[in-house]
Each structure stands twice: as C-alpha cells, then as structure tokens.
C-alpha cells in the first residue's frame, strides 16, 4: 500500500493598530484562510504463483481532495509599563470554513497476456462548514537593547467547541459533534524562549509544551508534545539572515480495534530546519 498526501494553508490579513502614549498598544485583524489537502491511497496485489488463470495484478486507488476558504477575527493588546517590560494578551475567534470534499476511485487490472482493464467511479462532491477552536493567548517579555530578550507565552485552546455544520442534503452532523464534545477538551500550551544579542549576531533558544487535546478518559491516545528549538541570526543595516532548528517529540496511541483497550503505540520525532533571509526598506 502507498499513501501520498500534500496540502497547504495560506492566510491573508487586513489589520488596524494604534497606541496610546507609547505605553498601550492595541490591534485587530481580519484573517482570510485558504486550505487545500489532497490524498492518494493505492492498494496493489500481485499474483506471483500463477494459481489464478490469466490474472497478474491489480491496483485500486482512492483519490480525495479537500479545499475551501475561511475567515477569523483577532484582537490583541500590549501594555508596556516600563521600557524593558511588555505584557500582552490576545483572542482569536474560531475560523469559519466553507469546505468542499471531492473523491473518486479507479481500478486497473493486468492480465498474463499483457492486456489490461481500467474502470473509474464518478466524481462525488460534498460541501459542508467547519469551525475551528477558540484561542486565548497571553504573554510577558523582558527586553533589552543591549543583551536581547526573554519571553513566556501561555495559550488555551478549546477543542471541544469545534463543529461541523450544514452539510449537503441537510446533514447536521449531530452524532459527529456529540463525539467531538465527548472526546475533546481544552488544552493549555506553554512556550518559553530567549534571544542573546552579541553585537550583530543573535543566539536563540526555546522550549514549548503542548497538552493533549483529549479529555481525561481519552488522553492515553496522545501524550504531550515537546518542542525544543535553537538558532542564530545576523543583522547588518537593512539585511538579515536567520537559521533555526526545532525538534518535536510526542507519542500517539491508536485503537486497532473498536475498543480503547486495544491500542498500538507510535513514537514520533519531527525535525525542522528553517533559513530566512531578507532586506528591510
């Protein structure tokens, strides 16, 4: 079996901001997101012992495509009581998506005489709406023009408020939404990081902890996610370049049968290298 996936999520912002006496800053934005996800799953069988007359192999392929557009609102504020201290908070509404799901299947059969036969299903389309969780963020940072900065951020995400709505044919997704409310809960996420300034060079490090989105009776399915990061950068006049590396570690337990007692454990490690360069003008 082979599974190929690809996708993208882009966002455009329309923002407005202001400040009072360079002590209190406030901003708001409208975000418009465009999402796309494609999946191709192929199952192949080959008859190697020649026990089936005139049959050699077949491929069964499933194609899926999810795409849509959504919008959200963000509101945030920063208070700077003294020059080196910043205290901030923000909220983000759910992102309200209008999505379309397309899928179809193909099957190819190959025979011993070299001939083949192919068949495809009709393309099926289903439209629906999705709202993502509400998010609240707060943070505090100590900054210095001489040595750099240290920051701490807290985020709360209410996964239980995710909802599916208004499917084609009057589908209301009541069982699915009941399952979301039963299985998912609120998660608390924590991030801490620092930047050390060494002339025109910058050294950075950070750590993040993301709680499981599952409620307590289901939280054995996924452990907390830990992310370690580090990097360095260089600044000169209007030019800058940054290098960063992050490693995420987490564990997931997936039911292999219908009961939660039958779980298979998978350990995940995700490494990312990021290089950024640019000019300011």
Cite the ranges covered by each PLM segment.
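Outer-membrane beta-barrel porins/channels
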Residues: 1-281
């Amino acid at each position: 079996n082979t599974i190929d996936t690809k996708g993208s999520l882009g966002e455009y912002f329309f923002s407005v901001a202001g400040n009072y006496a360079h002590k209190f800053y406030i901003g708001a934005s409208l975000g418009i997101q465009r999402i796309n996800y494609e999946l191709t799953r192929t199952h192949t069988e080959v008859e190697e012992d020649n026990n089936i007359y005139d049959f050699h192999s077949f491929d069964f392929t499933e194609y899926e495509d999810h795409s849509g557009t959504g919008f959200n609102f963000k509101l945030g504020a920063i208070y700077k009581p003294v020059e080196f201290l910043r205290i901030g908070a923000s909220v983000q509404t759910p992102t309200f998506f209008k999505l379309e799901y397309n899928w179809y299947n193909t099957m190819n059969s190959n025979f011993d005489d070299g001939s083949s036969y192919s068949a495809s299903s009709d393309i099926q389309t289903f439209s629906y709406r999705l709202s993502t969780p509400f998010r609240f963020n707060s943070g505090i940072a100590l900054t210095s023009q001489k040595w750099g900065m240290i920051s701490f951020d807290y985020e709360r995400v209410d996964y239980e408020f995710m909802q599916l709505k208004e499917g084609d044919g009057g589908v209301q997704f009541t069982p699915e939404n009941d399952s979301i409310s039963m299985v998912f809960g609120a998660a608390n996420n924590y991030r801490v990081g620092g930047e050390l300034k060494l002339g025109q060079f910058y050294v950075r490090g950070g750590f993040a902890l993301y709680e499981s989105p599952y409620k307590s009776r289901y939280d054995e399915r996924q452990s907390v996610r830990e992310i370690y990061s580090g990097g360095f950068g260089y600044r000169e006049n209007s030019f800058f370049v940054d290098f960063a590396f992050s490693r995420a570690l987490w564990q997931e337990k997936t039911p292999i049968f219908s009961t939660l007692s039958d779980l298979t454990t998978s350990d995940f490690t995700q490494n990312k290298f990021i290089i950024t360069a640019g000019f300011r003008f």
